From Swiss-Prot:
Alphabetical GO biological process terms: L-ascorbic acid catabolic process
Pathway: Cofactor degradation; L-ascorbate degradation; D-xylulose 5-phosphate from L-ascorbate: step 3/4
Induction: Induced by L-ascorbate. Repressed by UlaR.
Gene3D superfamilies according to UniProt: Divalent-metal-dependent TIM barrel enzymes
High-level lineage: Bacteria, Pseudomonadati, Pseudomonadota, Gammaproteobacteria, Enterobacterales
EC top class, as a word: isomerase
EC number: 5.1.3.22
Stated name of the protein: L-ribulose-5-phosphate 3-epimerase UlaE
Database matches in InterPro entries: L-Ru-5P_3-Epase, L-Ru-5P_3-Epase_Enterobacteria, Sugar_Epim/Isomerase, Xyl_isomerase-like_sf, Xyl_isomerase-like_TIM-brl
Highest taxon of the lineage: Bacteria
Amino acid sequence: MLSKQIPLGIYEKALPAGECWLERLRLAKTLGFDFVEMSVDETNERLSRLDWSREQRLALVNAIVETGVRVPSMCLSAHRRFPLGSEDDAVRAQGLEIMRKAIQFAQDVGIRVIQLAGYDVYYQEANNETRRRFRDGLKESVEMASRAQVTLAMEIMDYPLMNSISKALGYAHYLNNPWFQLYPDIGNLSAWDNDVQMELQAGIGHIVAVHVKDTKPGVFKNVPFGEGVVDFERCFETLKQSGYCGPYLIEMWSETAEDPAAEVVKACDWVKARMAKAGMVEAA
């Protein structure tokens, strides 16, 4: 793994749904991936992972050891439902408790990076107070993460509050903590009116991982690779030339497709071809 030029992973929701991580990691290995990113979203099913028993956590660790496929990151989107910026104190308290549990879970199973959703609120109307509460919630969260030695990394979002690396860097400077970094999504970054290459360059030194997906203005999910606006080759070239050597994660939602594995193989081949054109990997 450490000798590989590009660590390439796949999002959990791209693979067949289910709770058997040994099967999921075996499939990811068969498909040629180095790691899988876990999802803890706003559904009760995935939120319940944060309450796994010691034995369930150990089963995940054993699956990682057996397959050699890592689970180094968690996409924590549960804060859509329980936002840190909520003006409802009970909801906000639940959001902070989810953060505490996620950090503890990460510490237990070896997850190094928790990707945060940059929403002060999602289903409610945002205002100055929701943004203040969000900032304060991030500060408290980063203090917890620091004690656990787990990195919190902000995603560039489908939401105006955090739709550019420049905006996320403002939070990084505000928090001024090495355990808070950036996890840009080149699809989301490209769907807004951003100078994408300048934004990527600005984030170097703070980027710990990169989400890879295609998008269109106003359409942030399920855009087939090659049918959106993302200039993948230029993004990959910029990241390489800027010195980024970290992981890339193909983000897909094909878990309910007729043949998820076939969808993933098709997407992976497409992405690798663009990486090859950018000089990142050898052409197949």
